[in-house]
Amino acid sequence: MCGRSGLISTAVCPCATGLICQQRICRQPSTYKISVLMQLSEKPGPIGVFDSGYGGLTILHQMRNILPHYDYLYLGDNARAPYGARSFDVVYQFTRQAVIKLFSMGCHLVILACNTVSAKALRSIQQNDLPSLDPNRRVLGIIRPTAECIGSITQSRHVGIVATEGTIKSESYVLEINKLFPDITVTGEPCPMWVPLVENNEYDGPGADYFVKKRIENLMIRDPQIDSIILGCTHYPLLLNKILKYTPRGVKIVPQGEYVSNSLKDYFVRHPDIEAKCTKNGLCHYLTTENTDKFRESAQLFLHERVDVENITLG
């Protein structure tokens, strides 16, 4: 379950969330006009879920399993994906555009269902933008819930992280886990080809075997004592069969969806004011910045169902 807020820096997070406040780079307050505050509806709305691509659908899928009565609005910035190798500032600007869009469509709570976004943009959004956009709305990330749970999973106290280059370079998992569990050794392995394998529907082919085997072997060579591997990218559950194939026997694989969803459930118990602003009709709507036919086809890989989707423009 999600614990109380713990920041990487000494700055205070204005939203006091129980999920993550991750980014280590502070920026100047947003120049976005305070008048936006007056334009946002106070009526309850869906839970916003944002990802740069399709991976966040694995988080959404678990949310709908564990919290099925809520309404969800998923936004995928597929036209500009992947975010993994982009700079902190570019990821922040793209994420800010998405959050503003979801707020304008009635969301009072937005989940950044992307590790790169949670690592590179969350803290700036929380500290610099929410006070002017609407201090009563919330933007939460997905790294903290995973970090909180790993302490009860690892026995050797040696944990591996497989993630995008951006997430690994941010050291968000290392810092968050070490803050919660100083006795745990964390080793990160960047996997730059894994997201393209999923996005191009090649996650079950021979190319996937090559790239997954290479990265898992690299990780285990660097620290043979690892007994738990966190899938630090929401795309990676689709590679689970390949990952299990090349992971040594006895090493646990830790996907994020279940932990993030249970953390959100716990968050609602502790924040009934936010929970009351989330509508409950069991509905889900999808938005994408790319071709809707492509999104619809790719989404079926993650959700195993056909979805209705609307094209939008960000920026």
Regions found by a protein language model. Give the residues of each.
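Short, Lys/Arg-enriched N-terminal segments with co-localized hydrophobic residues
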Residues: 27-37
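Extended, compositionally biased low-complexity polar/Lys-Gly-rich tracts
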Residues: 25, 29, 139-141
